[in-house]
Amino acid sequence: MLDILEIRKYLPHRYPFLMIDRVVELIEGESITAYKNVSINEEIFQGHFPHFPVFPGVLLIEAMAQACGVLGFKTANKTPEDGSIYLFAGIDGVRFKRQVVPGDRVYFECKVVSAKRGIWKFDCVAKVDGELVTSATIMCADRVVG
C-alpha cells in the first residue's frame, strides 16, 4: 500500500534509522501491517554480533513505533512537514520470543487501542514466517515541533 518513498513522507527518520521498508495494509484509525527486510549488509551487524548476527530487539521495538507513527500520521492526515511529530512515549509488556537474523522479513502488525488528547496506544506484534518474534504495547505522543 505504501512504498518507501511514501513512507518517507510520513516519517522524519532517514538512513540508517528508517526501519520500515513497506506498508502492506493500513486501515486508518484501526491498524497497520508493515515489514522490514533484514540484510547482512546493515551496519549494526558489524558489532551485534560479528560471528552470530542478531538484529537488536530495541530496533524491533523502534520499527514497531515507526509503523505506529505512520498509522497515526495517516489517520490524522498529517505529515512531519506540517510541524507534527510522533514521539515514543512508553512501552509495556515487551516480550521477545525469537531471534531475527539476516535474511528475515519481519512483519509488524499494530492496532490502535486508544487515542486521547494526542496520546496514542497500540498493541503490536512482530512476526517472521508467521512465527511470533516480539509483542508490546506502545504509546506515542503527537506533538507540535518548532
UniProtKB/Swiss-Prot annotation:
It catalyses: a (3R)-hydroxyacyl-[ACP] = a (2E)-enoyl-[ACP] + H2O. Its EC number is 4.2.1.59. Pfam families: FabA (PF07977). One of its GO terms (cellular component) is cytoplasm. InterPro entries: FabA_FabZ, FabZ, HotDog_dom_sf. SUPFAM superfamilies: Thioesterase/thiol ester dehydrase-isomerase. The active site is at 48. Signal peptide: none annotated. It is found in: Cytoplasm. Keywords: Cytoplasm, Lipid A biosynthesis, Lipid biosynthesis, Lipid metabolism, Lyase. One of its GO terms (biological process) is fatty acid biosynthetic process. GO terms for molecular function: (3R)-hydroxyacyl-[acyl-carrier-protein] dehydratase activity. Involved in unsaturated fatty acids biosynthesis. Catalyzes the dehydration of short chain beta-hydroxyacyl-ACPs and long chain saturated and unsaturated beta-hydroxyacyl-ACPs. Belongs to the thioester dehydratase family. FabZ subfamily. This is 3-hydroxyacyl-[acyl-carrier-protein] dehydratase FabZ. It comes from Teredinibacter turnerae (strain ATCC 39867 / T7901). The lineage of its organism: Bacteria, Pseudomonadati, Pseudomonadota, Gammaproteobacteria, Cellvibrionales. The gene is fabZ.
